Design a protein with these regions (language model features):
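Bacterial N-terminal signal peptides that target proteins for export
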Residues: 2-10
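Extreme N-termini of proteins with methionine-enriched Sec-type signal peptides or N-terminal signal-anchor
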Residues: 1-2, 39
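Bacterial N-terminal signal peptides
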Residues: 11-20
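Generic low-complexity segments that are intrinsically disordered, proline-rich and/or Lys/Arg-biased
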Residues: 5-6, 15, 37
């Protein structure tokens, strides 16, 4: 029997790593390391971490909670009902939905796709917020945080674009269902990548996600339902 040389190397790889002092990082360990890099001291909190968007969020907000939880650990949560387009995207991509936020007290909160207090679940307190990722510009209604937190606001078309770019920087390959859903979020939020609401970063992220999800550019508008504006 002829053995492929790569097969022999694959069997020897664990021993090579052990002898060289290298250790393979588990998925949860990688999430913890990335959370520490992103949040700093706030990552050391022993409270459970929930990623949540505005009440009854858009597809971008709901799916961004899934992306943030995948990158940094914690639970993707939702306050209110998923919109029909969001449900359609998740079903099309075979991606599970965020969990309903039954209890927020005692949790650390990461906000995605929102940073104004008036848009939040009233149970969310400013003292709970440890991070904000949003594509909306800062305004007079922005949540007043009691202490320094990680805030990533970029004037792009979608929050999912920001998180996809973070995944690129971290070297994280999103699972195919999540990549598909993230693509749907960007297409949905930008109304089909319309020039008026789409940046070059949105197009770059959409192209990468489409390749990962196996969706052709010409299929985008027929694949994902758009939110009514």
């Amino acid at each position: 029997m002829i053995t492929h040389p790569l097969a022999s190397f694959a069997r020897l790889l664990p021993a090579v790593l052990l002898l060289s002092g290298c250790q393979l990082e588990s998925f949860s360990e990688r999430q913890a390391r990335q959370r520490q890099q992103f949040m700093g001291e706030a990552a050391s909190s022993q409270k459970p971490l929930l990623w949540i968007s505005r009440r009854s969020p858009t597809a971008d907000g709901a799916i961004s909670s899934l992306m943030a939880a995948h990158l940094y650990g914690g639970q993707a949560s939702i306050s209110g009902e998923l919109t029909p387009p969001t449900q359609a995207i998740l079903q099309r991509c075979q991606q599970s939905a965020p969990e309903p936020a039954a209890e927020l007290t005692g949790s650390a909160i990461g906000l995605v796709g929102v940073h104004e207090g008036s848009d939040l679940d009233p149970r969310v307190q400013a003292s709970q917020v440890v991070a904000i990722v949003d594509h909306h510009a800062s305004s007079s209604g922005s949540l007043a945080l009691e202490q320094p937190r990680r805030i990533d606001l970029r004037p792009w078309g979608a929050t999912a674009t920001i998180l996809e770019q973070q995944a690129q920087r971290l070297g994280v390959v999103l699972p195919k269902p999540l990549a598909c859903a993230a693509l749907g979020a960007i297409v949905n939020q930008t109304q089909g990548l319309q020039p008026a609401s789409t940046t070059s970063q949105d197009r770059q992220s959409a192209a990468r996600l489409a390749r990962r999800a196996g969706i052709q550019q010409a299929q985008l508008l027929t694949t994902f339902e758009l939110e009514a504006r």
